Amino acid sequence: MGRAGILRHRRLNRKWLAFNGLVPVPMRGFAAVMSSPLAGKIIVLGVTGSIAAYKAADLISQLRKQGAEVHPVLTKGGAEFITPLTLQTLARQPVAQDLWKEGQGWQPGHVDLADRADLLVVAPATADVIAQFAHGLAPDFLSSLHLVARCPVLMAPAMNGKMWAHPATVANVDTLKTRGVEFIGPDEGMLACGYEGVGRLWPVDGIVAKINSLLGVL
């Protein structure tokens, strides 16, 4: 292949990546992306009202670098900690927020997105959203999507240690686990409230590894 052919191949490769919403990667990294369990997978990422919401930016970046298509869903509480624009820019996808403003299609947006998802990840997951999922409540886009989704669900809790240890939260987590919901964390360390304890969001690298594990067996 001559120089002109190589350049043409590279241009076509970049166009293919852009068309599929992937982060452009060097040619030597293309094979690694395509061999990733995340390549071409659709991941819905729920971001809820925890100080750890800012870590969703890093999570999106890492998932997209491995070839995943990430669709952020931001709750009202989550929007207090990170902006929709940040998530949209990193994911290159619109950010779902309002259950009552889902676009012009005939099918409700949360239903369409749930039907297409390979995995629903909630990171960070607050005590509130864990309770909503456990009791089948559907007050917003994320909780409604959860009731429709038939894909695997992974939750990464982040909250005050006393909230995590409360009998209600413990019972809600146990309920969800019996339904097949996967959990990762929380981690132990200094919390935003000033206490040492269990409640920190699990490291992003660890969440990505867990996602790879879940999607690698589908």
Show where each model-derived region lies:
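Intrinsic, low-complexity polybasic segments
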Residues: 3-5
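A cross-family phosphate/adenosyl-ligand binding-site feature
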Residues: 22, 27-154, 161-218
